[in-house]
Design a protein with these regions (language model features):
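Structural signature of the two symmetry-related core transmembrane helices
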Residues: 70-86, 281-295, 375
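Juxtamembrane intracellular "pre-TM" segments in multi-pass secondary transporters
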Residues: 1, 194-222
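Intracellular juxtamembrane helix-capping segments at the cytosolic ends
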Residues: 115-130, 318-331
């Protein structure tokens, strides 16, 4: 089996597992377990902070990791720790007390160190395992397949919730998550690594200081930070919708279904359109689409929420796929490891900030104002990435 097929398989399996122990499902479970909305926001912030800490370390070490495939496969297992704790609470809800809350926070912190490791190395792994000319299409197709699989699982989860006990079904899917992480780790470890030959010039470019000499590293700090603020708010939309009584524990499960549909549709759209429209044009188009639809999510009732959120999610996942691809067009391949650490460090740190400011921002301008703030931040990101990519392309053209 080719590495591209294995890449699609392990990313699909990993994303299915990730779906059922994070995001809307995690938020709903925690609220059902007795966590307050503020505790959920704080937990999300902690998880992002631990990712940031690991990314900070990888800024200096990612280029020195020799066994990228092996370390990546091990990092797949990190979320098993947190999911086991979730499973214990779902199997025996009566045992959930203050000690359980503390256990969730501790294991979440530990698990998200591993998630931070996986986040960075997943961008480095393709350089060691595939032909990078296939990277754009492979990214779109693999993400679409992962979204389709996660959609089917999320749909099954939502349908089962309407017929059986919430905690019973949720505990079953926590078990599925654990199995998915183990299997994805095995598939990743089975990939064949290319022999990487590095000459003296490439070694100099691969020096961790080289990325700090690249002016685009600093210019892109701004859009990476503003995107993090926007996505940080986007990621807790289920909690926001429950807090405003638009959704409840049953209807909130459909948020996850929407996300998986949007993942599939957005990534398939990107995979077949990015060469015709160019990555930067797709990014700008998706940014405008998300900015128009997202602020309306809380204003039109339940049906309006699902409609606007579906559209916003579609464009959000086009953006999520476009940015890693456009980065390969802006940043030299020798600097991609350290740069990705910096990019994800800023992006994830901003997500942590976002979950901390939601409560005071809501007190000042209401939840609709919070969504408008997220929209403005996303717009800044899209416009700046477009401008930098256009500038780099023109610069390369002038050199020729």
């Amino acid at each position: 089996m080719s590495n591209i097929k294995k890449y699609c398989i392990f990313t699909t399996i990993y994303n299915v597992g990730f779906t059922f122990c994070t995001g809307a499902i995690m938020q709903t479970f925690l609220i059902q377990a007795g966590f307050s909305a503020e505790q959920v926001y704080l937990l999300n912030s902690l998880m992002q902070i631990m990712q940031v800490a690991m990314m900070l370390v990888l800024t200096f070490l990612s280029g020195k990791i020799k066994r990228v495939k092996t370390v990546t496969s091990i990092s797949h297992l990190s979320l098993c720790i947190l999911t086991v704790v979730f499973l214990m609470g779902a199997i025996n809800p009566e045992s959930i007390k203050r000690g359980y809350v503390i256990a969730v926070f501790i294991t979440a912190g530990i698990s998200y160190v591993g998630v931070g490791l996986y986040t960075i190395l997943s961008y480095c792994l393709p350089y060691y395992t595939i032909d990078m000319k296939d990277y754009g299409k492979m990214t779109g197709v693999s993400a679409a397949i992962a979204g389709g699989a996660s959609f089917l699982m999320s749909l099954a989860y939502s349908l089962l919730l309407s017929k059986f006990s919430y905690m019973k079904i949720t505990s079953t899917f926590f078990i599925i998550s654990i199995l998915c992480f183990i299997l994805s780790s095995i598939v990743c470890a089975s990939m064949r690594e290319k022999i990487m030959e590095t000459n003296e010039e490439e070694r100099e470019k691969n020096d961790v200081t080289a990325v700090f000499k690249n002016k685009n590293t600093y210019i892109l700090l701004i859009p990476n930070f503003t995107r993090g603020l926007s996505i940080g708010i986007f990621n807790v939309i289920a909690t926001i919708a429950i807090s405003t009584s638009i959704l409840n524990e049953t209807t909130s499960s459909y948020v996850n279904v929407i996300l998986q549909i949007a993942t599939f549709a957005g990534n398939m759209f990107f995979a077949f359109a990015y060469k015709k429209l160019s990555t930067k044009n797709l990014l700008l188009f998706a940014t405008i689409g998300a900015c128009v639809s997202f602020p309306l999510s809380l204003e039109l009732g339940v049906a309006g929420f699902f409609c606007c959120f579906t559209v916003a999610s579609f464009f959000r996942f086009v953006i999520d796929t476009a940015i890693p691809v456009i980065v390969t067009e802006i940043i030299p391949k020798e600097q991609i490891g350290p740069y990705t650490s910096i990019r994800m460090l800023v992006f994830t740190g901003a997500q942590a900030v976002a979950t901390l400011i939601i409560t005071p921002l809501n007190a000042a301008v209401g939840y609709t104002g919070v969504l408008i703030f997220a929209t403005v931040m996303l717009f800044i990101c899209g416009v700046m990435y477009y401008a930098v990519a256009k500038s780099v392309k023109q610069s390369i053209g002038n050199q020729k």
